Protein backbone atom coordinates (compact mmCIF):
# COMPACT_ATOMS: atom_id res chain seq x y z
CA UNK A 1 0.00 0.00 0.00
CA UNK A 2 1.41 3.38 -0.96
CA UNK A 3 2.37 5.07 2.28
CA UNK A 4 2.50 1.83 4.25
CA UNK A 5 5.13 1.91 6.95
CA UNK A 6 6.77 -0.27 9.57
CA UNK A 7 8.41 0.50 12.87
CA UNK A 8 10.94 -1.45 14.93
CA UNK A 9 10.86 -0.71 18.66
CA UNK A 10 13.63 -1.94 20.93
CA UNK A 11 13.42 -1.75 24.69
CA UNK A 12 15.74 -3.57 27.07
CA UNK A 13 14.90 -7.28 26.85
CA UNK A 14 12.25 -6.99 24.10
CA UNK A 15 11.97 -6.12 20.42
CA UNK A 16 8.65 -5.33 18.73
CA UNK A 17 8.12 -4.92 14.99
CA UNK A 18 4.87 -3.43 13.70
CA UNK A 19 3.99 -3.21 10.04
CA UNK A 20 1.02 -1.81 8.18
CA UNK A 21 -0.52 -3.76 5.30
CA UNK A 22 2.32 -5.06 3.14
CA UNK A 23 2.96 -7.15 0.07
CA UNK A 24 6.38 -8.62 -0.58
CA UNK A 25 5.44 -9.34 -4.19
CA UNK A 26 6.47 -6.78 -6.79
CA UNK A 27 3.43 -5.28 -8.47
CA UNK A 28 3.07 -2.98 -11.44
CA UNK A 29 2.93 0.22 -9.37
CA UNK A 30 4.68 -0.77 -6.16
CA UNK A 31 7.86 -2.66 -5.45
CA UNK A 32 7.55 -5.46 -2.93
CA UNK A 33 8.24 -4.61 0.70
CA UNK A 34 11.80 -4.43 1.94
CA UNK A 35 12.40 -4.63 5.66
CA UNK A 36 15.63 -3.36 7.18
CA UNK A 37 18.39 -5.89 7.86
CA UNK A 38 18.26 -5.18 11.59
CA UNK A 39 14.94 -7.02 11.82
CA UNK A 40 16.69 -10.37 12.24
CA UNK A 41 15.32 -11.07 15.72
CA UNK A 42 11.89 -9.94 16.85
CA UNK A 43 10.12 -10.98 20.05
CA UNK A 44 6.72 -9.61 19.01
CA UNK A 45 5.55 -9.18 15.43
CA UNK A 46 2.33 -7.33 14.59
CA UNK A 47 1.24 -7.20 10.94
CA UNK A 48 -1.89 -5.58 9.59
CA UNK A 49 -2.77 -7.60 6.52
CA UNK A 50 -5.68 -8.30 4.20
CA UNK A 51 -4.31 -11.69 3.16
CA UNK A 52 -1.84 -12.44 5.92
CA UNK A 53 -2.83 -16.07 6.32
CA UNK A 54 -2.42 -16.96 2.65
CA UNK A 55 0.43 -19.04 1.32
CA UNK A 56 2.49 -17.22 -1.33
CA UNK A 57 3.51 -20.57 -2.83
CA UNK A 58 -0.07 -21.10 -3.99
CA UNK A 59 -0.16 -17.87 -5.97
CA UNK A 60 0.24 -17.74 -9.72
CA UNK A 61 2.87 -15.76 -11.56
CA UNK A 62 1.94 -12.06 -11.84
CA UNK A 63 2.65 -11.84 -15.58
CA UNK A 64 0.81 -15.09 -16.25
CA UNK A 65 -2.25 -13.85 -14.38
CA UNK A 66 -2.14 -10.53 -16.24
CA UNK A 67 -2.25 -12.38 -19.56
CA UNK A 68 -5.05 -14.66 -18.32
CA UNK A 69 -7.04 -11.57 -17.36
CA UNK A 70 -6.37 -10.06 -20.79
CA UNK A 71 -7.52 -13.23 -22.52
CA UNK A 72 -10.76 -13.35 -20.51
CA UNK A 73 -11.43 -9.65 -21.11
CA UNK A 74 -10.76 -10.04 -24.84
CA UNK A 75 -13.36 -12.84 -25.10
CA UNK A 76 -16.01 -10.78 -23.28
CA UNK A 77 -15.32 -7.58 -25.25
CA UNK A 78 -15.27 -9.47 -28.57
CA UNK A 79 -18.84 -10.57 -27.86
CA UNK A 80 -19.82 -6.94 -27.18
CA UNK A 81 -19.96 -7.42 -23.42
CA UNK A 82 -18.75 -5.25 -20.57
CA UNK A 83 -16.13 -6.25 -18.00
CA UNK A 84 -16.67 -5.45 -14.33
CA UNK A 85 -13.58 -5.65 -12.12
CA UNK A 86 -14.62 -4.99 -8.52
CA UNK A 87 -11.59 -4.31 -6.37
CA UNK A 88 -10.53 -2.86 -3.05
CA UNK A 89 -10.31 0.94 -3.22
CA UNK A 90 -6.88 1.14 -1.63
CA UNK A 91 -4.16 -0.27 -3.86
CA UNK A 92 -6.07 -2.81 -5.92
CA UNK A 93 -8.12 -0.32 -7.98
CA UNK A 94 -5.02 1.64 -8.93
CA UNK A 95 -3.17 -1.54 -9.88
CA UNK A 96 -6.10 -2.87 -11.94
CA UNK A 97 -6.56 0.38 -13.90
CA UNK A 98 -2.90 0.27 -14.87
CA UNK A 99 -2.94 -3.43 -15.73
CA UNK A 100 -5.92 -2.85 -18.03
CA UNK A 101 -4.22 0.22 -19.54
CA UNK A 102 -1.10 -1.83 -20.28
CA UNK A 103 -3.20 -4.59 -21.84
CA UNK A 104 -4.82 -1.97 -24.08
CA UNK A 105 -1.52 -0.35 -25.03
CA UNK A 106 0.06 -3.71 -25.88
CA UNK A 107 -2.90 -4.60 -28.10
CA UNK A 108 -3.97 -7.59 -25.97
CA UNK A 109 -7.40 -6.03 -25.49
CA UNK A 110 -9.18 -3.29 -27.45
CA UNK A 111 -9.39 0.28 -26.22
CA UNK A 112 -12.75 0.69 -24.50
CA UNK A 113 -13.80 3.27 -21.91
CA UNK A 114 -12.68 2.59 -18.34
CA UNK A 115 -14.68 3.87 -15.40
CA UNK A 116 -13.61 4.40 -11.80
CA UNK A 117 -15.83 5.47 -8.93
CA UNK A 118 -15.87 6.50 -5.31
CA UNK A 119 -13.01 5.89 -2.93
CA UNK A 120 -10.97 4.01 -5.54
CA UNK A 121 -10.89 7.15 -7.66
CA UNK A 122 -10.04 9.35 -4.66
CA UNK A 123 -7.14 7.07 -3.70
CA UNK A 124 -5.97 7.15 -7.33
CA UNK A 125 -5.64 10.93 -7.01
CA UNK A 126 -3.35 10.37 -4.00
CA UNK A 127 -1.25 7.89 -6.01
CA UNK A 128 -1.00 10.50 -8.75
CA UNK A 129 0.05 13.21 -6.30
CA UNK A 130 2.76 10.99 -4.78
CA UNK A 131 3.77 9.13 -7.95
CA UNK A 132 7.47 9.64 -7.17
CA UNK A 133 7.07 6.91 -4.50
CA UNK A 134 5.79 4.36 -7.00
CA UNK A 135 7.88 1.66 -8.65
CA UNK A 136 10.05 3.40 -11.29
CA UNK A 137 8.93 1.08 -14.11
CA UNK A 138 5.27 1.28 -13.20
CA UNK A 139 4.07 4.37 -15.10
CA UNK A 140 0.79 5.43 -13.50
CA UNK A 141 -1.86 5.95 -16.15
CA UNK A 142 -3.29 9.49 -15.88
CA UNK A 143 -6.59 9.49 -14.04
CA UNK A 144 -8.01 11.66 -16.81
CA UNK A 145 -7.91 8.56 -19.05
CA UNK A 146 -10.62 6.96 -16.94
CA UNK A 147 -14.13 8.32 -16.89
CA UNK A 148 -16.38 9.14 -13.98
CA UNK A 149 -19.34 6.83 -13.76
CA UNK A 150 -21.64 8.87 -11.58
CA UNK A 151 -24.00 7.44 -8.99
CA UNK A 152 -23.67 3.66 -9.35
CA UNK A 153 -26.83 3.23 -7.28
CA UNK A 154 -28.85 5.01 -10.00
CA UNK A 155 -30.17 2.28 -12.33
CA UNK A 156 -30.30 4.64 -15.32
CA UNK A 157 -26.55 5.33 -14.96
CA UNK A 158 -25.73 1.62 -14.99
CA UNK A 159 -28.17 0.90 -17.84
CA UNK A 160 -26.58 3.64 -19.96
CA UNK A 161 -23.12 2.30 -19.18
CA UNK A 162 -23.92 -1.26 -20.21
CA UNK A 163 -25.32 -0.29 -23.64
CA UNK A 164 -21.82 -0.49 -25.15
CA UNK A 165 -18.62 -2.40 -24.30
CA UNK A 166 -16.49 -0.98 -21.52
Task: Outline where the language-model segments fall.
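His/Asp/Glu-rich metal-coordinating catalytic cores
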Residues: 1-95, 99-108, 113
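Hard-cation-handling environments
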Residues: 69-166
Amino acid sequence: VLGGASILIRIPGHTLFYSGDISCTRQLLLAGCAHPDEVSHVDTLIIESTQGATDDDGRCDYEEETHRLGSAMRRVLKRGGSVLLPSFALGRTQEMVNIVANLQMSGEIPFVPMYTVGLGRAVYEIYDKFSSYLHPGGALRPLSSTQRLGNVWDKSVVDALLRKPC
